[in-house]
C-alpha cells in the first residue's frame, strides 16, 4: 500500500515540510454511489424514452480476442460504464471503447471478464457446471459470482427502439384492485412462485451492492408511492418449487392472508423437470394454476390475479424444455376468467435474447435473473397496474403530521444528536427531501456506529391517533459506517406507556417505514414521538455523520 502527496502548479523547490495520515482502515461498501432514488430510476420503463439506465452485460473473450458485448439498443452516446455493484466507474479509451456498436475492452482494462475456456467444460462437475444439451457443461455459480463480474451501461438511443411486447393497463380486468388503488384504500398483494419470484441471485438476495430490492418489492413500493395506498406485500414464494406444490400449498400460503391481488409466478422448475425432457406438460401446468386461483377464491371470491409467464433458462443447458409453452395456457385462463390478467415475460425475455446473451442477464447462468432482468419483471407488472393518467393527491386515509415545510416544527435533539435543522438539500443521495422543499436533518458526533441516535418531538397538545392503523415516516442517512447494515426505531409515548417498533433500512435512500399501531391501546393520547437511527454490526467509532427524516404521519383504518 502506498499513500502519496504533492503540491501542484509549481516545480520550484519546497523546503522540508511534512504531511500526515491517520486511521487507515477498510470500509464495507454500502452503496454510497446509489444514484438518486435507486428504485425510481430502476423502474423507468425500458420501452419508453431515449436513455437506457444501467443495462447489464458480462464481457466475454472468444478464442483469445478482446472481450466484448452487445447492447440491447444501438447506442448514440455512452453516459457511464460501471460495475454492477455500482462501486466502480470505468473510463472510455482507458477501460473500454465502442466498436461497431459493441462495447469492447482495451488491452489493459480494469473491467472483469470471462473467457470461453472459463465458461465451457468438457465434463460435468457438481456444484460448478450444468450439463449442456449436446454434451459438455457450462459454468454455473450461485451467490454473487456473476453479479461481481457484470458491468452496467447507461446510454442514449433512438426513440421507439424496443420491438417486443409492452404491458397494457389492466384496469378493465382488475377492477377491484384499481378501485382500491385509485381511492387510496389499503391493498394486500401476495406474490406466489418459485425462486425467481423469491428474488434469488438478485443483489439484495446475495447481500451485494447495490442491494436492489426484489422485483415484487419494487412493484409494491412503486404502486404505493404512485397511488398513496398502504400496500401490504407478502412474498410467499419458495425456491425450487413448481406449480403442483403451489396448488397444494395455496390455502395456507395465499388464501389465509385474504389477498386482494395475487401475482402467480411459477413455470421455470415446471418446465425443466429433472432435466431429461420430463418437464410438466402445458395442460397439467394450466390445471395447477387454475387450482391456485380456485383455492384462493373459495375463501375470497373477489381476489384478483396477475399470472406471470416465466423467463427462459439457459438454452445451452438441459434446463430448457417446456417453459416456452406455458404462457399460452396462462393467457387462456385470463381470457376466460374475470379478474385475471397475464404478463408475458416469456416473450419479453425471448426478445431480449435476440440482442443480448443469456449471461448478460443472469445471476447464476442457468435460470435466475440478475438485477437488470428483475427490473423487466417489475416494470412490466407495474405497467399493467400503474395508471399514469391518474394524478394522485394525498389519499383520504393519509394524515401527514410533520412535513418540515415551515421549519423543525418542534423537533429537537435526543440522545447522541448534536443538532437538528430543516434543510432543502442533503450531501448524501438522493440530495434532497423525500417530499416538498424541506426535510429534517440530524447531525451526530463521533461515537460507536451501533449507538442509537435520536430526534424527538413533544406535541403542543397530545395527538389523538384513535383512528390510526399505521404510523409512517421516511428516513435516510449517510453511508460509510463500516457496519453490516442500518436500523431505525420509532417510539410513541402516551405518558408512561410506550409503543416501539424497529425496522431495517439502507443508507443513501429514502426508506418508507410503516409501524402497525392499530391495536395499541394508548394511541388516543400520544405525548411524545422519538425516531432513532443506528448502524449494525460495528461498534467502532463512526466519525460525525447525519441522518434525515421527512413526511411523518399516519394512515387511518
Question: What do the PLM-derived regions correspond to, one by one?
Answer:
Residues 161-236, 249-258:
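Serine-esterase "nucleophile elbow" of acetyl-processing enzymes
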Residues 265-269, 294-326:
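Active-site segments of SGNH/GDSL-like serine hydrolases
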Residues 30-164:
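Extended beta-strand solenoid/passenger and fiber regions
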Residues 27-41, 52, 391-420:
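Extracellular carbohydrate-recognition regions
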Residues 427-451:
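Short carbohydrate-recognition loop motifs
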Residues 449-471, 481-483, 504-507, 521-525, ...:
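Extracellular/lumenal carbohydrate-interaction signature centered on repeated Trp-anchored short motifs
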Residues 310-392:
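Catalytic His-Asp segment of secreted/periplasmic serine-dependent ester chemistry enzymes
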Residues 1, 493-527, 538-540:
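Extracellular carbohydrate recognition and processing domains
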Amino acid at each position: 500500500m502506498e499513500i502519496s502527496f504533492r503540491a501542484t502548479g509549481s516545480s520550484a523547490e519546497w523546503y522540508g515540510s511534512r504531511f500526515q495520515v491517520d486511521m487507515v482502515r477498510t470500509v464495507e461498501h454500502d452503496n454510497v454511489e446509489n444514484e438518486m432514488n435507486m428504485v425510481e430510476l430502476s423502474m423507468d420503463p425500458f420501452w419508453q424514452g431515449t436513455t437506457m439506465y444501467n443495462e447489464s452485460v458480462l464481457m466475454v473473450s472468444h478464442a483469445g480476442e478482446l472481450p466484448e458485448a452487445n447492447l440491447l439498443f444501438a447506442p448514440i452516446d455512452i453516459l457511464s460504464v460501471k460495475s454492477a455493484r455500482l462501486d466502480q466507474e470505468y473510463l472510455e479509451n482507458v477501460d473500454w471503447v465502442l466498436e461497431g456498436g459493441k462495447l469492447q475492452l482495451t488491452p489493459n482494462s480494469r473491467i472483469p471478464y470471462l473467457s470461453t475456456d472459463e465458461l465451457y467444460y468438457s465434463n460435468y462437475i457438481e456444484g460448478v457446471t450444468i450439463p449442456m444439451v449436446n454434451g459438455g457443461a457450462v459454468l454455473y455459480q450461485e451467490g454473487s459470482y456473476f453479479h461481481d463480474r457484470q458491468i452496467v451501461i447507461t446510454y442514449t438511443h433512438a426513440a421507439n427502439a424496443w420491438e417486443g411486447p409492452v404491458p397494457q393497463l389492466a384496469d378493465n380486468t382488475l377492477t377491484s384492485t384499481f378501485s382500491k388503488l385509485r381511492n387510496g384504500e389499503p391493498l394486500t398483494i401476495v406474490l406466489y412462485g418459485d425462486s425467481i419470484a423469491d428474488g434469488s441471485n438478485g443483489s439484495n438476495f446475495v447481500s451485494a451492492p447495490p442491494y436492489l430490492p426484489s422485483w415484487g418489492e419494487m412493484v409494491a413500493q412503486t404502486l404505493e408511492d404512485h397511488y398513496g395506498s398502504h400496500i401490504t406485500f407478502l412474498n410467499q414464494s419458495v425456491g425450487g418449487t413448481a406449480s403442483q406444490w403451489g396448488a397444494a400449498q395455496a390455502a395456507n400460503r395465499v388464501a389465509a392472508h385474504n389477498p386482494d391481488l395475487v401475482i402467480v409466478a411459477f413455470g421455470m422448475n415446471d418446465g425443466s423437470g429433472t432435466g431429461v425432457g420430463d418437464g410438466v406438460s402445458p395442460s397439467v401446468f394450466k390445471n395447477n394454476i387454475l387450482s391456485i386461483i380456485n383455492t384462493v377464491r373459495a375463501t375470497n371470491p373477489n381476489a384478483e390475479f396477475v399470472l406471470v409467464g416465466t423467463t427462459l433458462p439457459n438454452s445451452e443447458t438441459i434446463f430448457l424444455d417446456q417453459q416456452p409453452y406455458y404462457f399460452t395456457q396462462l393467457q387462456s385462463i385470463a381470457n376466460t376468467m374475470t379478474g385475471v390478467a397475464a404478463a408475458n415475460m416469456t416473450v419479453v425475455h425471448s426478445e431480449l435474447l435476440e440482442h443480448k446473451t443469456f449471461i448478460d442477464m443472469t445471476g447464476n447462468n442457468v435460470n435466475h435473473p440478475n438485477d437488470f432482468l428483475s427490473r423487466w419483471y417489475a416494470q412490466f407488472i407495474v405497467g399493467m397496474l400503474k395508471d399514469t393518467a391518474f394524478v394522485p393527491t394525498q389519499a383520504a386515509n393519509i394524515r401527514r403530521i410533520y412535513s418540515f415545510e415551515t421549519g423543525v416544527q418542534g423537533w429537537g435533539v435526543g440522545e447522541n444528536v448534536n443538532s437538528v435543522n430543516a434543510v432543502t438539500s442533503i450531501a448524501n443521495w438522493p440530495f434532497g427531501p423525500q417530499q416538498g422543499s424541506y426535510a429534517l436533518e440530524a447531525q451526530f458526533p463521533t461515537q460507536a456506529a451501533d449507538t442509537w441516535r435520536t430526534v424527538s418531538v413533544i406535541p403542543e397538545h397530545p395527538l389523538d391517533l384513535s383512528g390510526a392503523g399505521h404510523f409512517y415516516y421516511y428516513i435516510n442517512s449517510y453511508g460509510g459506517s463500516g457496519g453490516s447494515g442500518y436500523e431505525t426505531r420509532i417510539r410513541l409515548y402516551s405518558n408512561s406507556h410506550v409503543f416501539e417498533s424497529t425496522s431495517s433500512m439502507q443508507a443513501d435512500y429514502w426508506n418508507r417505514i410503516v409501524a402497525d399501531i392499530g391495536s395499541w391501546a394508548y394511541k388516543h393520547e400520544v405525548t411524545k414521538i422519538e425516531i432513532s437511527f443506528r448502524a449494525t454490526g460495528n461498534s467502532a467509532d463512526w466519525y460525525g455523520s447525519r441522518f434525515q427524516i421527512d413526511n411523518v404521519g399516519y394512515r387511518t383504518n
